[in-house]
Curated annotation (Swiss-Prot):
This is Serine/threonine-protein kinase-like protein E. The keyword Magnesium does not apply. Residues 256-284 are annotated as: Disordered. Residues 256-269 have a biased composition (Polar residues). The record marks I44 as: Defective ATP-binding. ATP binds at L21, G22, Q23, N24, S25, L26, G27, Q28, Q29. It comes from Synechocystis sp. (strain ATCC 27184 / PCC 6803 / Kazusa). The gene is spkE. Pfam families: Pkinase (PF00069). InterPro entries: Kinase-like_dom_sf, Prot_kinase_dom. Belongs to the protein kinase superfamily. Ser/Thr protein kinase family. Keywords: ATP-binding, Nucleotide-binding. Residues 15-404 form the Protein kinase domain.
Length: 614
């Protein structure tokens, strides 16, 4: 079928078509950018169907079901609309590969999925299937082709709801997806995309523990001989060390030959299975992923006698050396255990996994790659002390490309730093930032003044937050006109957006007065980079004192109502006393440069003239 949308087309004045993904069971599918949601990627399925057409009704039914669902392992609904005779379904874009494609790649190598992988696949699918069944929805097509492995976290995600429907009350209908889960598992284990019974024969061709084999046979029965709670318990209680000791010998199966359909075969005509190569550190109790097949009992017995003979010779000649080696190994193991901390055995993420996580975080913010790179480069320029004009110079050794900034490690660290800063913004500030609406910082000052605060108090609050997330920019530079032209100034503006909101909703602002008292006592907790502002009316010609009880990482500013005079500004000195001879609102700002929350108490006192010492 000819694609109905062209690349670069803007559909419904909103969706910018990026790529034709192909055709699924109902229609053509495209990758697009949602220009109303920070250019987030999404998929659009298009179906051309006349009114009342059966396919069109199925398409609408799928959209209605998706509309009612909200789960992180479902390609969630965004919009459904019609234009002329075409129906459009918009869903979240899931970056990854279908399990059908993953299985196809394995088959080209003469391999399939291991038992441990399929166990995990089943366990990870159970929460989303259970969620569907709570909604009285049967997915109806649990198969490798309708499930994707999401790149960012490796979780299986349901993407095709073509055959989904609400329960109609037919006996066994609530267990249809259990049967589908069993069919999907056997497909991944055997490489048979459309497996057929007898199931025992299929399962005999792969290395499985007896417990998992029996569980699969219960799923594959119709109706399934296991319910949802029992399946969950059985999967969680399967033994972890299930393989026979023959796997320890590291026997190698026959190298598979490639067949026309891409599935490898051994010389015996049976499907091959990947072998296990254990490292010298592996022990007999180590977790083994796959079991090799041995052709017949005779071969096993023969090889066992040979092995036993070799072991006897080794025992006779090397017992002393063996004991010494064991002692050394035990000592080394004990030393290693003594040094290791909990979690040391967690595998490090690959570069690809890290990059995918970073991309997912950036996409969630709705910021283009080019703009994000500009922010990162600006951060590195501040960190490395590089002048912006120098950044624009051309490097003759890179064919005219701009100078690259920092080492790969510095670039990665700055990427994380900028992401953390942007993710600290509220949704409204993020939208304002993504749409380049932050503008001139001075546009907010009239609203700040309505709170009886000046721009310097407001800037103290914003600067504290900005410096917490982006410390490579010196606080002294934040007020300079040159900084307002830098890319990172846009982040400052977005943080100012949030800071103003926190003042106006009075979550970080309070107006105070000494009506019938000479003393005010305040207290609170400051999160890292956070601040509070107070507008205080203090009678003139009186002695006034303030005392802040807080860790040294707290900072305080104290400004008079008028003029450029500064009493305290971002000061680590937490105590002050003196005359307050101006009428109006004095401004108090408390901020934190700590890396953890800190508590504070603030005491404000008026000392009457009669109580002052002569």
């Amino acid at each position: 079928m000819t694609p109905s949308l062209s690349l670069g087309q803007r559909l419904d004045d909103r969706y910018l078509i990026q790529l034709h993904l192909g055709q699924n069971s109902l229609g053509q599918q495209y990758l697009a950018q949602d220009t109303h949601r920070f250019d987030e990627p999404c998929t659009i399925t298009v179906l051309t169907a006349p009114p009342g057409d059966k396919a069109g009704n199925l398409f609408k039914q799928q959209a209605e079901i998706l509309y009612a669902l909200d789960h992180p392992q479902i390609a969630n609904f965004r919009e459904f609309f019609a234009l002329g005779s075409e129906l459009y379904l918009v869903q979240d874009f899931i970056e990854g590969q279908s399990y059908f494609d993953l299985l196809k790649d394995r088959r080209l190598q003469g391999k399939a999925f291991t038992e441990l992988e399929v166990r995990q696949w089943c366990r990870q699918l159970l929460p989303v299937l259970h969620y569907l069944h709570i909604q009285k929805i049967c997915h109806g097509q649990i198969s490798p082709s309708s499930i994707m492995r999401r790149t960012v976290d490796g979780l299986p995600v349901l993407v095709d709801f073509t055959h989904s429907q609400y329960y109609s009350g037919t006996p066994g209908e609530d267990r249809r997806d259990l049967h589908g889960l069993g069919l999907g598992a056997i497909a991944l284990l055997t490489g048979e995309v459309n497996p057929n019974p007898p199931w025992e024969n299929l399962l005999s061709s792969v290395a499985l523990s007896q417990e998992f084999r029996q569980l699969l046979l219960k799923l594959l029965a119709w109706p399934p001989l296991v319910d949802w709670p029992t399946l969950t318990d059985n999967l969680n209680n399967l033994p972890q060390h299930f393989l026979p000791t023959v796997a320890e010998f590291n026997l190698t199966s026959t190298i598979p030959e490639q067949t026309d359909n891409g599935v490898g075969k051994s010389s015996t005509g049976e499907p091959p299975f990947p072998t296990v190569h254990q490292s010298p550190e592996s022990s007999s109790s180590a977790k083994v992923k796959n079991m090799v097949r041995v052709d017949g009992l005779k071969g096993l017995v023969k090889k066992s006698f040979i092995l036993l003979g070799l072991m006897a010779i080794a025992m006779a000649l090397g017992w002393g050396a063996g004991q010494l080696w064991l002692d050394n190994q035990q000592r080394a193991a004990l030393e290693k255990l003594a040094q290791e901390e909990p979690g040391d055995d967690v595998p490090e993420k690959t570069d690809l996994e890290i990059k995918n996580e970073i991309r997912a975080r950036r996409l969630n913010l709705g910021i283009s790659p080019q703009r994000f790179q500009t922010l990162m480069d600006d951060g590195l320029a501040f960190q490395l002390g590089i002048d912006p004009q120098q950044r624009l110079e051309k490097n003759p050794n890179t064919n005219g490309a701009p100078l690259s900034l920092g080492s790969p490690e510095q670039q990665m660290a700055m990427t994380i730093t900028v992401l953390d800063a942007l993710e600290s913004l509220s949704r409204e500030a993020t939208r304002d930032f993504a749409q380049n609406n932050s503008g001139d910082r001075r546009r907010w000052i009239p609203r700040v003044n309505q709170l009886r605060l000046s721009s310097r108090s407001f800037y103290d609050l914003v600067n504290a937050r900005f410096h917490h997330y982006l410390p490579m920019v010196s606080p002294a530079l934040l007020g300079e006109p040159e900084f307002e032209q830098r890319p990172l100034a846009q982040v400052w503006n977005a943080m100012a957006f949030d800071s103003l909101a926190s003042l106006e909703d009075e979550s970080h602002y309070q107006r105070l007065s000494f009506d019938d008292t000479n003393q005010l006592n305040l207290n609170g907790t400051l999160e890292p980079g956070e601040g509070y502002a107070y507008a205080v009316t203090i009678p003139p010609t009186e002695e006034f004192s303030l005392q802040l009880t807080a860790p040294p990482t707290a900072r305080i500013s104290f400004y008079p109502p008028t003029g450029p005079e500064v009493i305290l500004q971002n000061s680590a000195m937490h105590r002050w006393s003196g005359p307050t001879d101006q009428a109006g609102y004095y401004e108090l700002v408390i901020t934190s440069v700590a890396e953890e929350p800190i508590a504070f108490e603030l005491e404000l006192s008026i000392i009457p003239a009669s109580a002052q010492p002569f």
